[in-house]
Amino acid sequence: MIKYNCSISERGVSWGLVGESVKENDTVENLDRLFKAAKGGGYEVFISPHYLYPADQAWGFGGAAERMMLEGKEFFRPDPLSLEGLDSSGADWLDRYRPYIEDGKTVVVSPHKVWGPQTNDLVLQLRKRRIGRVILSGMLANLCVESHLRELIEQGFEVAVVKDATAGPRHPDLGDGYEAAVVNYNFIANAVLTTEEVVAAML
């Protein structure tokens, strides 16, 4: 789903919160394995990007993680109509994923704004392709991934979450986002799988 420098790179502004979880899950490598298997097996791949623009800095309220995101300028792009400054920024893809995402076949939908796909066209793009089953991965486990899971389930999709192809923040006051997410995945998703299980099923 989403694999940005901000949230998955050691250079990213979120690394202090997510780094341990990313390394423990081997998230970067597992996402690469999923991309490779999906592309090799002819599966359609969708990216639900998370972008924030200067106008979004004027928001008057938000939750704790939302405020951290805005204050840290995570996923920030200076202009919604220009790609200037995007390359290698926190809002850019990890370089190792670029060949998969920019192959002319991956569907990059319009950006979501907070956590879920209610504000973008992911559901429309899936329905227009008569896709009813989704394998979900990406960042962050308890925020965007869980929010996408909940909305896709509500919209009638069957959703499997790849639990080691995601990671979550660990905050001294707010808690362990990854552990919280996995509990909810087990309650909500149609399946909770490992990368190894998904890759084996795709071959």
Model-derived features with residue positions:
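Short, conserved micro-motifs enriched in small and acidic residues
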Residues: 21, 25-28, 143
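Basic, amphipathic juxtamembrane/active-site segments
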Residues: 9-24
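Catalytic-core segment of enzymes that process non-peptidic bonds
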Residues: 47-56, 62-63
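Short acidic, Gly/Ser-rich segments with clustered Asp/Glu that frequently serve as metal-coordination loops
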Residues: 1-7
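A short, N-terminal amphipathic alpha-helix
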Residues: 25-44
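Ser/Thr-centric signal marking residues that sit
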Residues: 27, 48, 166
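Active-site-adjacent betaalpha module
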Residues: 8, 36-41, 58-59, 64-203
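Short beta-strand segments at enzyme active-site cores
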Residues: 43-50, 162
